[in-house]
Amino acid sequence: MIFHAFLIKYAEIAIKGKNRYIFEDALVKQMNIALSKIEGEFEVKKEQGRIYVFCPEQYDYDETVDALQHVFGIVGICPVVIYEEQGFEQMAKDVVSYMKNCHPNYNGSFKVYTRRAKKSYPITSMEVSAELGGRILDEFPDASVDVHDPELTLSVEIRDKIYVYSQTIKGAGGMPIGTNGKAMLLLSGGIDSPVAGYMIAKRGVKIDAVYFHAPPYTSERAKQK
């Protein structure tokens, strides 16, 4: 299955109120830095309360996911398949095709969650979810619907195109680097200082590391360490 984009989920940033855009912009900046090291032209966009990474036609999926997993501020990465918006019947066919490709022979519980960002769409979110769920059951008779605690949540977002995803890959969490001041980190040569640096960086602090080497009192082995 070829994924055309990634939906980026974040947690703490969402409660920042009127300052939320500052944290979102910082997260987008860090994502662009991480993705710039990968071959291909990626586009990171904020759209109606969401952050998406739009991928080039040819890209390394595993390398892209790994880069995003190391960006503080991201709690979840959802691989997205994008379909053209050509009416409900075509959307239903596309969603069933997605299930057949990503979850062949599925026999567990599921629910369809629809988000209608395109408010001009003539069918409500609940109606879309119910109808799509029925179409999926027709193709997967051993599956069952559970709207409270499903094993699989199939998300459908109706925008200018149809965005479909069902997987969330765990991110690093925390806050984007640069949103909570700066700090100096003294690297002592042990494991404690880099761990402390990682933990404070995860809270959005920009770290500058310092190491003191004082020969002959500091051995070459300690320097290498």
Residue ranges of model-derived segments:
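Conserved G/P- and acidic residue-centered "switch" motifs that form tight phosphate/ATP-binding loops
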Residues: 190
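RNA-binding accessory domains that recognize and position tRNA/RNA substrates
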Residues: 1-184, 194-224
